[in-house]
Amino acid sequence: MELQLAIDLLNKEEAAELAKKVEEYVDIVEIGTPIVINEGLPAVQHLDENISNAKVLADLKIMDAADYEVSQAIKFGADVVTILGVAEDASIKAAVEEAHKHDKQLLVDMIAVQDLEKRAKELDEMGADYIAVHTGYDLQAEGQSPLDSLRTVKSVIKNSKVAVAGGIKPDTIKDIVAEQPDLVIVGGGIANADDPVEAAKQCRDAIEGK
C-alpha cells in the first residue's frame, strides 16, 4: 500500500519545502490542480528537482488533448499524471499509451463518474495504472465519504490499482486502510496539520499496520 501527499493550496516553493519535510513517509507527492492552475507545469518541475525518492504526480485532471498534455507533464518531471474518468475513451487510451511510452503511469480520477462499476471495468481494460475514487471538496462539505465507492471499484477491477482520496486524515485513515486500497491519498490531513511531519508519520504507520 502506498501513501500520497496531495498539495493543493501552497505555492511551488512552499510545496517543495513541505514535500522535503515528509518525503521519508510518502511514496508519491502530488502537485494539485490549483497549483498547476496558478503556476503551471514549472511547479511540477520545481518539486521534481527538490525531492529524490518519492514519485511526482501532476494532477492535471485531463479531459481532452490527452497525449499532448501527458507528454508535457512528463517533460516537466511527472512520474504519474491524472485524467478524468468521464473523459472520452479515445482520450483515456491516448493518455495510457503516452504515459507507458515513457515508462510513466496514469491515474484516472473517478470524480463525477455516475456508474462507477461500469466505468471502472472499462478503465481497467484500457490499461489505467490507478483508478482513484475521489470525494471532492464540494461533496466532502456535504459529509460524503469515499468508502462505498472504494469497495465498488475494488470489487470489479483485475489489473489496475485502486486509489482513494477525499478528506482522509490521520484520525480516519485506519478505516480506509482496512479496505485495502493500493494507494491512499491524503491532502489537508497532512498539509494543514499543526505538525505535518508527525501527521505523515501517523499515516505511514497506519498503512504499515503499526
UniProtKB/Swiss-Prot annotation:
Disulfide bonds: none annotated. Its EC number is 4.1.2.43. It catalyses: D-ribulose 5-phosphate + formaldehyde = D-arabino-hex-3-ulose 6-phosphate. One of its GO terms (molecular function) is hexulose-6-phosphate synthase activity. SMART domains: OMPdecase (SM00934). Pathway: One-carbon metabolism; formaldehyde assimilation via RuMP pathway; D-fructose 6-phosphate from D-ribulose 5-phosphate and formaldehyde: step 1/2. Catalyzes the condensation of ribulose 5-phosphate with formaldehyde to form 3-hexulose 6-phosphate. Belongs to the HPS/KGPDC family. HPS subfamily. This is 3-hexulose-6-phosphate synthase. It comes from Staphylococcus haemolyticus (strain JCSC1435).
